[in-house]
């Protein structure tokens, strides 16, 4: 029986795709690097920032990463005022329903915890969430299972009573690696086929479909 939902943020709860793509592309311009296509950037969503940068520029010297990160965060802070995250349809209402029904709800993201917490507050989701974990709260990020394992340990919930929900294959891989159930959402930054290939137990097209699935695990 599912007692805990561990939710991704970007592409699962909120649409941040335009913000992430435009931030990356503007950082590339400022740093003098070739501007990558939007889809190439979208494919890195869900990875920690540094890993995403190295995926886009495999030959980038590691000593160049701090400047990259600094420029990225400067651009991000500027752009988020104009194209900040928007909740996907039905997210807030569904979280309120799940919370009222007694489910524990947590968030595990590759975003830094200060940014993640700020977005959750701004979007009015904090009343429903009991635990928030960002990239800086673990030593190994998605697709490694550590974010799920730490959440389970801190909340004293066994893996077989948890459902990991995310839009990217790395979310599914993270959940499976921890022994939890997994559910992909097809409306985010990936697609149904990729999520099924990653091993998702279920894939939904709307966040509001999730409550009706829980009794089936």
PLM regions: where:
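N-terminal helical cap/lid subdomain that shapes the substrate entry/recognition surface
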Residues: 2-93, 97-101, 126
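Conserved phosphate-coupling serine/threonine residues in phosphotransfer and NTP-handling enzymes
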Residues: 12, 109-111
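Asp-based, Mg2+/Mn2+-dependent phosphohydrolase catalytic module
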Residues: 1-3, 96-99, 112-113, 117-217
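Residue-level marker of regulatory loop/turn positions in helix-turn-helix DNA-binding domains and
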Residues: 87, 108, 140
